[in-house]
A protein has these predicted regions:
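Short, low-complexity disordered leader/linker segments with a strong preference
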Residues: 1-39, 64-65, 112-119, 324-325, ...
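Hinge/cleft segment of the Venus flytrap/periplasmic-binding protein
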Residues: 33-36, 183-184, 280, 284-331
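Extracytoplasmic "Venus flytrap"
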Residues: 37-66, 71-84, 101-105, 165-175, ...
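Short, solvent-exposed amphipathic alpha-helices that sit
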Residues: 51-66, 144-148, 172-190, 208, ...
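Short beta-strand elements in bilobed, periplasmic/extracellular small-molecule ligand-binding domains
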Residues: 64-77, 161-166, 181-202
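Hydrophobic alpha-helical segments within soluble ligand-binding/sensing domains
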Residues: 83, 137-162, 174-175, 204-206, ...
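Hydrophobic alpha-helical
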Residues: 88-92, 96-115, 180, 198-260
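Flexible loop/hinge segments that line or gate small-molecule binding clefts
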Residues: 104-143, 147, 154, 161, ...
Length: 331
């Protein structure tokens, strides 16, 4: 009888231990309830460009993975006044954090306004270091330009005339242009003949590239540091029937660029891992709200935020060897 009682007690003890060990995994835990209503918003412009599909994808994915609400807002065109208005509307929603593409310094005041209201802001893609933002997540832009410059130099046999297509005034693009210049200056037989404004518009870029080809009939290469440039340059080179004669280095991995690589019109593209930018920016904001790392005995008193200040999401060279893996499926 004593053995039976002992066995019953042992079984009861095992059951209670198992129940205790599995309890924290319950989906109805207080942590899950606390975060499911949290809201994180990305504010951008140029939402009509294929490039920003990956921004939207990154925000959607991080929301699903963290179990929080996410939104992507902002104008379809390059309109800073409309973007500021979208940012103001985002502040009014009192989100747990805001992710913003730092196109221009004109965004600094509204970023500071959010910070002053207790809403932390992380910049992505292009930085606003004077805005008071808590972190930047994006490409090491100068290094991206250096990689593109080295690739272009090899494609043209380290000699010849080249042009660079950009949108002046954006800090991230200026850094890429600086990277191209640094890479190409190592080759004395390469001359940068002109830097052209695309206005981040594929149609304008195509017209600008066509003018370049007429002005410099011996042009060896075109370097593009933003998404519209590659598409426009490809259109102009194809219409002039100069595929293979004028080497194009594009930027990023829109389907039109990837197809042009497979068709032999664009030689290669420097592709950012764009979806990682809003993904990790939101992760930083989420951690700031929910899971602080004790860097010191008192982070707040010590002036320590306990988050990375800069995250480099890196770039990948896309060419004929790997282009097929970058083609997006139908949205």
């Amino acid at each position: 009888m004593k053995k039976v009682i002992a066995l019953v007690l042992l079984v009861a003890l095992v059951i209670s231990l198992v129940a205790c060990s599995t309890a924290p995994a319950s989906p109805t835990s207080s942590a899950a309830k606390d975060t499911k209503d949290q809201l994180y918003i990305e504010v951008s412009a140029l939402g009509n460009l294929d490039y920003f599909y990956d921004h939207k994808l990154g925000m959607k994915k991080v929301g699903e993975d963290l179990g929080v609400k996410t939104e992507y807002v902002g104008p379809a065109e390059y309109d800073m006044n409309a973007m500021v208005a979208a940012f103001e509307q985002a502040i009014a929603k009192k989100p747990n954090g805001i992710v913003v593409v730092g196109f221009e310094d004109s965004l600094n005041p509204v970023v500071k306004k959010a910070q002053d209201a207790g809403i932390p802001v992380v910049t992505v893609d292009a930085d606003l270091p004077a805005s008071g933002r808590i972190a930047f997540v994006g490409t090491g832009n100068k290094n991206a330009g250096i990689m593109g410059g080295e690739k272009l130099a090899q494609l043209i046999g380290t000699k010849g005339k080249v042009a660079i297509m950009t949108k002046p005034g954006q800090s991230n693009l200026e850094e890429r242009v600086a990277g191209y210049k640094e890479a190409l200056k190592k080759y004395p037989d390469i001359e940068i003949v002109q830097i052209v404004d695309t206005k981040s518009d594929p149609v304008v870029a195509a017209q600008a590239a066509a003018t370049l080809l007429q002005k410099y009939p011996d042009l060896a290469g075109i370097a593009c540091v933003e998404a519209a440039g590659g598409s426009g340059a490809a259109t102009a080179v194809k219409e002039a029937k100069l595929q293979g004669k004028v080497q194009i280095i594009a930027m990023d991995r829109g389907n039109d660029v990837v197809q042009a690589i497979e068709d032999g019109v664009i030689s290669a593209s420097v592709a950012q891992q764009t979806a990682l930018m809003p993904y990790y920016a939101t992760q930083i904001l989420y951690n700031l709200a929910n899971s602080k790392v004790d860097i010191t005995t008192d982070n707040k008193a010590a002036g320590v935020q306990g988050i990375p200040a800069v995250v480099d999401t890196g770039v990948i060279i896309v060419d004929k060897t790997n282009a097929k893996y970058f083609m997006r499926q139908a949205k």
